[in-house]
């Protein structure tokens, strides 16, 4: 269980998730995380360059790796070994280009493409019988795609892997889909990336059905990889959040990667403005609270602690403290930096709404302090809140208070509300006993 931060200056470092995320990502996807700095103008530290050098050494990005080596060791020129490797990479590229030229030319031919169908076996048979294409030629597409990926030529790699996938249906097809997904991320093609995520999700559900361990591992990878579009592509946030909350994926998070709760909490909170009154949003918020409560012994950080303080402990002072720590964490997290301001704004609304629900007379100065705002800022905030949420409330500017008009609930309604849950549980137990 994560300990509470004692020094707000190092809270982001203390709760860094890099060691948890990296084992579940490809090295090309790890690069932007290691290269990330909240301060874009800051000079890259030597230790960071050393990490990047070790990360990218196995790739074919020879010029970039050679430059990193030169910087790390303070050399005037790139070492000869990198120049030699660059020549070897270029020779290998030319060879693969030549070996795949025939099949690439065929797949560029509109007359050939119009004869291809959804049946991959039939496609390969057609190309083999009509144009003399061999299985080896098809495999060379995969080899060339993997090579280009290693070189960092992501758009071309994506095209080669896509063409390979049109013609095969085996384990390599799944590997090609993972590779194409990474290419789409690194080329910032979010719509195509979402298509690949959906393909992988279906593949994991259907083709790994008889191998639960492999299914769990692949779902874990897909959850981590999906963090890239989750906060970088607004249209995808809702569908990916739905995926994370689906039974198989929420079970994977609880079993294999509870630290993903940070990102799930951020996604739910930042979705507040879109659907705070929708049944789906309210259900997700309730599910999030339940899971944070269940997993508190296994994982916690200021983001999940904020949820706990606000919705489980109803401790508004603690919620404000955790929100302050959360803001720092978000601004130092590669995935969450762009959502930091949106999260803080939505979180303040949630604090205000919860506070107003349980108090009839609210001191503006006190609520402003709980929101981390000055009294003037707090007053404006409350005015906007009353207007936006259309709650029945009046501001007494002279007394510096807000008077909430909570409609009285009849005794009968209170009894109904309190017994409704018990009645439902009794029905479930009765049904279980009857079986």
From Swiss-Prot:
Q: Which GO terms describe its molecular function?
A: translation initiation factor activity
Q: Which domain of life is it from?
A: Eukaryota
Subcellular location(s): the record lists: Cytoplasm
Predominant location? cytoplasm
The record ties this protein, via InterPro entries, to: eIF3e (IPR016650), eIF3e_N (IPR019010), PCI_dom (IPR000717), WH_DNA-bd_sf (IPR036390)
Q: What are the PCI domain coordinates in residue numbering?
A: 241-409
The GO cellular component terms are: eukaryotic 43S preinitiation complex; eukaryotic 48S preinitiation complex; eukaryotic translation initiation factor 3 complex; eukaryotic translation initiation factor 3 complex, eIF3e; nucleus
Q: What's one GO BP annotation on this UniProt entry?
A: formation of cytoplasmic translation initiation complex
Q: Where are the transmembrane segments?
A: none
Q: Which UniProt keywords apply?
A: Cytoplasm, Initiation factor, Protein biosynthesis
Role this protein plays: Component of the eukaryotic translation initiation factor 3 (eIF-3) complex, which is involved in protein synthesis of a specialized repertoire of mRNAs and, together with other initiation factors, stimulates binding of mRNA and methionyl-tRNAi to the 40S ribosome. The eIF-3 complex specifically targets and initiates translation of a subset of mRNAs involved in cell proliferation.
Assembly, per entry? Component of the eukaryotic translation initiation factor 3 (eIF-3) complex.
Q: Which family does it belong to?
A: Belongs to the eIF-3 subunit E family.
| Protein name, per record | Eukaryotic translation initiation factor 3 subunit E
């Amino acid at each position: 269980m994560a300990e509470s931060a004692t020094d707000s200056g190092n809270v982001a470092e203390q709760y860094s998730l890099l060691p948890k995320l990296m084992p579940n990502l490809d090295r090309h996807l790890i690069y932007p995380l290691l290269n990330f700095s909240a301060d874009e103008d800051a000079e890259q530290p030597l230790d960071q360059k050393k990490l990047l050098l070790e990360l990218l050494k196995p790739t074919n990005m020879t010029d970039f790796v050679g430059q990193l080596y030169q910087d790390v060791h303070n050399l005037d020129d790139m070492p000869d070994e990198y120049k030699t490797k660059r020549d070897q990479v270029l020779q290998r590229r030319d060879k693969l280009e030549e070996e795949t030229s025939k099949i690439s030319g065929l797949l560029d031919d509109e007359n050939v493409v119009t004869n291809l169908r959804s049946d991959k076996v039939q496609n390969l048979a057609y190309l083999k019988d009509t144009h003399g294409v061999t299985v080896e030629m098809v495999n060379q597409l995969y080899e060339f795609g993997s090579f280009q990926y290693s070189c960092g030529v992501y758009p071309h790699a994506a095209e080669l892997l896509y063409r390979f996938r049109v013609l095969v249906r085996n384990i390599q097809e799944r590997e090609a889909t993972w590779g194409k997904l990474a290419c789409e991320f690194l080329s910032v093609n979010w719509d195509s990336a979402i298509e690949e995520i959906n393909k992988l999700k279906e593949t994991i559900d259907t083709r790994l059905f008889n191998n639960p361990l492999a299914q769990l591992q692949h779902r874990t990878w897909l959850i981590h990889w999906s963090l890239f579009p989750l906060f970088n592509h607004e249209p995808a946030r809702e569908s990916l959040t739905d995926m994370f909350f689906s039974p198989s994926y929420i079970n994977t998070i609880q079993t294999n990667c509870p630290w993903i709760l940070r990102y799930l909490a951020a996604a739910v909170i930042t979705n507040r403005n879109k659907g705070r009154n929708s049944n789906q949003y309210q259900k997700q918020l309730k599910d999030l609270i339940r899971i944070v409560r269940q997993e508190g012994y296994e994982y916690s950080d200021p983001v999940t602690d904020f949820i706990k303080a606000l919705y489980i402990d109803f401790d508004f002072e603690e919620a404000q403290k955790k929100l302050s720590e959360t803001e720092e964490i978000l601004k130092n997290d590669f995935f969450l930096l762009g959502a930091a301001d949106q999260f803080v704004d939505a979180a303040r609304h949630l604090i205000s709404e919860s506070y107003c629900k349980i108090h009839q007379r609210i001191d503006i100065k006190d609520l402003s302090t709980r929101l981390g705002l000055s009294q003037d800022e707090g007053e404006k905030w409350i005015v906007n809140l009353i207007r936006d949420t259309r709650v029945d409330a009046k501001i007494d500017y002279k007394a510096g208070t807000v008077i909430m008009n909570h409609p009285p609930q009849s005794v009968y309604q209170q009894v109904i509300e309190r017994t409704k849950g018990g009645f439902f549980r009794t029905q479930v137990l009765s049904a279980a006993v009857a079986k």
